[in-house]
Amino acid sequence: MSAIVDIFAREILDSRGNPTVECDVLLESGVMGRAAVPSGASTGQKEALELRDGDKSRYSGKGVLKAVEHVNNQIAQALIGIDANEQSYIDQIMIELDGTENKGNLGANATLAVSMAVARAAAEDSGLPLYRYLGGAGPMSLPVPMMNVINGGEHANNSLNIQEFMIMPVGAKSFREALRCGAEIFHALKKLCDSKGFPTTVGDEGGFAPNLNSHKEALQLMVEATEAAGYKAGEDVLFALDCASSEFYKDGKYHLEAEGRSYTNAEFAEYLEGLVNEFPIISIEDGMDENDWEGWKLLTEKLGGRVQLVGDDLFVTNPKILAEGIEKGVANALLVKVNQIGTLSETLKAVDLAKRNRYASVMSHRSGETEDSTIADLAVATNCMQIKTGSLSRSDRMAKYNQLLRIEEELAEAADYPSKAAFYQLGK
């Protein structure tokens, strides 16, 4: 039987040493599902609430004992006895139990931990891997990875405002080959940084955080590292940026302190267009502030036909906000972060809405991660065709990549690696 007989949460630590919620769900059959929740550094204003204790005497106020208590009491009482296969029903019970738009009572970290653990338990009970349990028996694609090799912004203590500089191995024939390509470029970049006297310490997501004079210098380093590893930038490898523009948008201007310049939204769109013209950039995330819809419209009109424009802080994995963006014709891709919305069911709804409107989806980690690899299975289950889960270092990032290797091995000949077809909204 797949009825839930026990739900138990605990406080564990994430990759930054901050508390987060882990949950175990036990079924009548004796199987157990376990899941842990990630946490972001640069967060969208409209994200579901991550409930923290606020007690400055514990973990500087970042404890999650209240969220744990909500799981072990209200949520457990509401869900024990329900069939774990009823994922949508279970998630809806938690949504109604919380009673707010942003999971403000129970905390999205509480509801998501339970939601993911229920899915894992149900998959185990059915004898299926999680990606098959959630994705069904149809054909599946492994995702093209966005590998964060240079960190800036909120993810590093350096001079760069743009938060992530990523490589995408589009010339690979398999995920295994793509991972090898990324790792070889990562190590070539480390040697290059070392030779130029830059520190080779890594940021929150495993990328290097050199103190550079400009964003162009970071992109040029990536070109050099790609070539040093034996690959061609623009053919084997394309670049992606996460601007996280909301972090440097103040008083109606985009302030690039590293370059000593401030831009209006029209000027910043031109700045980004200049980078696209000079470097092989295929994807730009959060190119405008989350509330600058005018700027997003300008950017989409300027670059949306040839570059993937990803809404993260803009859409916060929320189907209602995504629907508004689709109606207004802004961006052309959705970044998918399960903890932005707080349940698996709502996450899957957002991905489905994006697909139906020819918006690409990019499954994503957070900067504060755990060893939980659920998003790897989700990327395959939803046929997202793209995943963003950090650099080629730190076990919290590699856990996702290694799970994708296992999935590709299990799927064997049925595993497709989409390469440039991952950018289907651009007609690639």
UniProtKB/Swiss-Prot annotation:
Name by which UniProt lists this protein: Enolase
Associated pathway: Carbohydrate degradation; glycolysis; pyruvate from D-glyceraldehyde 3-phosphate: step 4/5
Keywords in alphabetical order: Cytoplasm, Glycolysis, Lyase, Magnesium, Metal-binding, Secreted
Cofactor: binding details: Binds a second Mg(2+) ion via substrate during catalysis.
Keyword Ribonucleoprotein: no
Cellular compartments annotated: Cytoplasm; Secreted; Cell surface
Organism whose genome encodes this protein: Neisseria meningitidis serogroup B (strain ATCC BAA-335 / MC58)
Major place of residence: cytoplasm
